[in-house]
Amino acid sequence: MFKRLSLYTLLLCLVPFFIWGISYQWHGNSQLTQADYWLYLLTETGSVPYALITCVLFTLLFAFLFKNPKQWILGVIVMGISVIATQAAKTGAKALFEEPRPFTVYLAEQTHSTPENFYKNDRTLRAEIAKNFYSMDAITPAWLVHHYENETGYSFPSGHTIFAATWLMLAVGFTQLLGNRSFKAKLLVVGIAVWGLLMLISRVRLGMHYPIDLLVATLLAWLINSIIFAFLKKKAIFVMK
């Protein structure tokens, strides 16, 4: 199980490594295409409140992996613990490191200010500043202005990435733990892996994160879920029979 969790973690880590490899850096929205709107819709599946719908959907999609309703209910509790623990780790790291997002750095550069001055304001004022600046930018579409307005927190690590990576770890972990090797189980893992990869790409493409934010968030999800599944392996109700 540990090897399989690590394998899918490595898969997600290919995104930041590839971005570094091609020396891609976001600096404004001049390269936006129609495809980026679809990435925005996908990234919203990890944004509040839509992330709650995503969680409910995944808990239902995971149901067939479990042998009985009791096992599924316990599995849902584990899923909740995993999501809460990883989001708590992300929130703590953001508060500790206070790294600005790419789009806020760009805003500061263009207004001859500094990211530090931007983040001295409360969230309401930061949202207003971001909205006013990017609304005047002809190349930034309204949907992205709205996204910036709602995402004026810190950058490191990526909350959307840790959310997607956590659900991939849960899919891989439970299929391994419960010994479900069915085509449906494989399809579930592959589907979530593709969703996760696109989520990571969207965060850099839309000016929300740097590659290091994605890498550390993915590794945090791997670490926390590796601990969770190492614990679950010792519990009889989840042991393969």
Curated annotation (Swiss-Prot):
Alphabetical UniProt keywords: Cell inner membrane, Cell membrane, Cell outer membrane, Hydrolase, Lipid degradation, Lipid metabolism, Membrane, Phospholipid degradation, Phospholipid metabolism, Transmembrane, Transmembrane helix
Keyword match Cell membrane: yes
Stretches for region Phosphatase sequence motif II: 157-160
Localization annotation: Cell inner membrane; Cell outer membrane
SMART domains in UniProt: acidPPc
Pathway: Phospholipid metabolism; phosphatidylglycerol biosynthesis; phosphatidylglycerol from CDP-diacylglycerol: step 2/2
UniProt topological domain (Cytoplasmic) ranges: 63-67, 174-184, 236-241
Periplasmic side: 22-52, 92-158, 205-210
Residues annotated as site: Stabilizes the active site histidine for nucleophilic attack: D213
Family per record: Belongs to the PA-phosphatase related phosphoesterase family.
Protein task: Catalyzes the dephosphorylation of diacylglycerol diphosphate (DGPP) to phosphatidate (PA) and the subsequent dephosphorylation of PA to diacylglycerol (DAG). Also has undecaprenyl pyrophosphate phosphatase activity, required for the biosynthesis of the lipid carrier undecaprenyl phosphate. Can also use lysophosphatidic acid (LPA) and phosphatidylglycerophosphate as substrates. The pattern of activities varies according to subcellular location, PGP phosphatase activity is higher in the cytoplasmic membrane, whereas PA and LPA phosphatase activities are higher in the outer membrane.
Record's protein name: Phosphatidylglycerophosphatase B
Gene that this sequence comes from: pgpB
